[in-house]
């Protein structure tokens, strides 16, 4: 028998060939592409790497003229399929003539299933009755890969249909909204993109920023004391006070005493359960919290998955399935920096396993599948460490702390001091708490502590924090915006479009103007409701409760309604956005010619700089600093050639 195995990428094909051939596979290069061949049990096997999606959807050539194509017609227009690259499809057709069966071994999720089905359609175009089977695995470890190929299943056609529906729906929403906004609001020069997930996500960032701007800080007061040697700090019971007079009255009740008397000491135990297992969104949020962008963290995780070091990194699941081989995984960590901790877990009579709120059956939560490869310290090592420590924490006992509350009295005023000590670090040994804890000295009822100070401390209520990429991902998950695989890409897109900026995310003038205008003149585009409904309907396709045609028709109907609403307010919408984006791009009069304006532009190499609007008559230019400030031009920072001919405004 001659068998073709389809992998999603070259690195995955190499790993599968290495495992299945036990290291005997040979790399073959032909007709501009590479694949792997080997023989096993009398069968000839070819492992062929795809390149992600091998079919692109786009509108016909006649629909690509933005000015001539009516947008209502565009909504109902069927996109055309284009094979890409052509050489890859030619290679597949060549294989079809000689193979007996094909095994789909792309990532097991919606996109992976669709990628495999795209290639399968090319093969069956040549050999209509070609047998196709599916190998499902959640880790590229030798054991799991071999089990998947020993027990293949039928391809999941419904899963692929759900992904195909998403392609059609996202293409239509993105094309129609982007064309409308660019033509009506972009002055013909600036691309203004919008989408059914992108725009509600932008609004989340804008609303949080607006909440912060509108926040009115209120002052409040606490009364604190320092007493004893070494000194302990205690806070007056009854606070905080919303008027300073209340705090002053309480200080007066304390009188002129010179000691704080311990009235009673209470002890209790606090148990903090271990954290839930990582799914994709919580993993990326934690990476963001610790300073790594979600997109970079996902690239590193994908690389670790392909090398067999972690499980599949795209999952909603926060509950380990019963089949998870915890002891086997812990055993693999015996030759790693986590060996001592893993061995202590193995020595326990019973492992306690935490669980999160989301349970699915596609893939398990993220976890290590092998000891880390020996490599230089870098992003992949950091991401592996993040995932491994979280996994070990989820198998660990609760953290136990002894909490002490000491009630002190000065005059007629009661104060409370709280301290804690660690009884059993539990999971915090592998995931230490970064917050410092206070420890109280040994206090007994009746102790008189020398009073050092009583003071009134004024504070102010704090506004809600700006979103970070991590908190935005978690909010998107909670509201049903996007999927585990696309959320970080949407956030990344907002940065690339220059709608948002900064680690603490702020909207740019263009981003704020766009989302504010749409919130008034096309609110359905900016709220999660419509997007969440379409996400639910695509899940219905995956589970066999709806068809691609039904859901695409629903989407088209909704998009017609949104477009009609936007058209009804096209003048107001366009004026709003144009006014705001002009002032964002304009940096004042040119100080060289006085007739032009300094505007932000982008050079051929992608550098942003300030140049005169009268270019090429006036060639005045400045560098832009990280915070947008004007800096003297420097040839060492950007070449004159790259900046010589500016492109459209950034």
Where are these regions (language model features)?
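Structured, non-catalytic alpha/beta "coupling" segments that mediate domain-domain communication
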Residues: 31-60, 199-244, 393-439
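C-terminal or mid-to-C-terminal helical accessory/interaction module adjacent to the motor/catalytic core
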Residues: 97-98, 140-227, 267-271
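Metal- or metallocofactor-binding catalytic centers and their adjacent structured scaffolds
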Residues: 244-277, 284, 447
């Amino acid at each position: 028998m001659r068998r073709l195995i389809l992998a999603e990428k070259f690195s995955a094909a190499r790993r599968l060939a290495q495992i299945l051939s036990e290291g005997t596979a040979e790399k073959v290069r032909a007709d501009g592409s590479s694949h792997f061949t080997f023989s096993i049990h009398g069968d000839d096997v070819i492992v062929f790497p795809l390149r992600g999606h091998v079919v692109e959807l786009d509108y016909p050539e006649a629909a690509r003229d933005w000015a001539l194509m009516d947008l209502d017609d565009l909504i109902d227009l069927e996109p055309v399929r284009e094979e890409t690259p052509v050489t890859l499809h030619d290679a597949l057709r060549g294989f079809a003539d000689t193979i007996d069966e094909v095994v789909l071994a792309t990532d097991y999720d919606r996109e992976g299933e669709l990628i495999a089905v795209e290639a399968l359609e090319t093969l069956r175009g040549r050999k209509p009755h070609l047998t196709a089977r599916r190998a499902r695995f959640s880790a590229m470890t030798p054991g799991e890969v071999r089990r998947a190929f020993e027990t293949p299943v039928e391809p999941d056609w419904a899963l692929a249909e759900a992904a195909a529906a998403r392609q059609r729906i996202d293409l239509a929403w993105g094309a129609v909204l982007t064309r409308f906004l660019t033509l009506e609001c972009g002055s013909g020069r600036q691309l203004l993109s919008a989408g059914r997930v992108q725009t509600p996500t932008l609004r989340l960032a804008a609303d949080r920023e607006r909440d912060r701007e509108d926040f009115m800080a209120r002052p409040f007061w606490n009364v604190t004391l320092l007493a004893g040697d070494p000194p302990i700090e205690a806070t007056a019971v009854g606070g905080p006070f919303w008027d300073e007079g209340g705090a002053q009255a309480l200080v007066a009740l304390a009188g002129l005493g010179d000691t704080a008397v311990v009235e009673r000491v209470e002890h209790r135990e606090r148990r903090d359960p271990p954290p839930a297992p990582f799914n994709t969104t919580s993993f990326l949020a934690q990476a963001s919290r610790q300073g790594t962008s979600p997109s970079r963290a996902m690239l590193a995780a994908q690389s670790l998955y392909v090398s067999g070091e972690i499980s599949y990194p795209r999952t909603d699941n926060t509950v380990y399935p019963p089949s998870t081989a915890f002891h086997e995984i812990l055993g693999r960590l015996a030759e790693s920096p986590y060996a001592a901790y893993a061995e202590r877990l193995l020595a326990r009579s019973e492992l306690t396993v935490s669980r999160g709120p989301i349970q699915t059956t596609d893939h398990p939560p993220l976890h290590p599948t092998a000891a880390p490869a020996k490599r230089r310290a870098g992003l992949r090592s950091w991401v592996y460490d993040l995932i491994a420590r979280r996994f070990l924490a989820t198998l660990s006992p609760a953290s136990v702390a002894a909490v002490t509350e000491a009630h002190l009295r000065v005059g007629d005023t009661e104060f409370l001091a709280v301290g804690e000590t660690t009884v059993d670090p539990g999971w915090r040994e592998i995931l230490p708490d970064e917050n410092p804890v206070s420890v109280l000295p040994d206090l007994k009822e009746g102790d008189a502590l020398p009073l050092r100070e009583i003071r009134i401390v004024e504070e102010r209520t704090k506004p809600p924090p700006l979103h970070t990429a991590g908190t935005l991902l978690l909010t998107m998950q909670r509201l049903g915006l996007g999927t585990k695989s696309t959320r970080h890409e949407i956030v990344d897109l907002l940065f690339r479009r220059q709608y948002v900026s900064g680690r603490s995310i702020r909207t740019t003038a263009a981003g704020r103007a766009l989302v504010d205008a749409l919130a008034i003149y096309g609110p359905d585009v900016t709220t999660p409701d419509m997007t969440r409904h379409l996400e639910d309907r695509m899940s219905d396709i995956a589970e066999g409760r709806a068809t691609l045609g039904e859901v695409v028709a629903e989407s088209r109907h909704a998009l017609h309604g949104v477009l009609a609403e936007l058209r009804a307010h096209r003048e107001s919408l366009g004026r709003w956005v144009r006014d705001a984006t002009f002032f964002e791009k304009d940096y004042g009069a040119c100080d060289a010619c006085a007739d032009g304006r300094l505007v932000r532009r982008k050079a051929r190499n992608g550098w942003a700089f300030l140049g005169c609007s009268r270019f090429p008559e006036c060639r005045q230019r400045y560098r832009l600093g990280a915070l947008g400030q004007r800096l003297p031009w420097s040839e060492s920072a950007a070449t004159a050639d790259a900046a010589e001919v500016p492109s459209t405004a950034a």
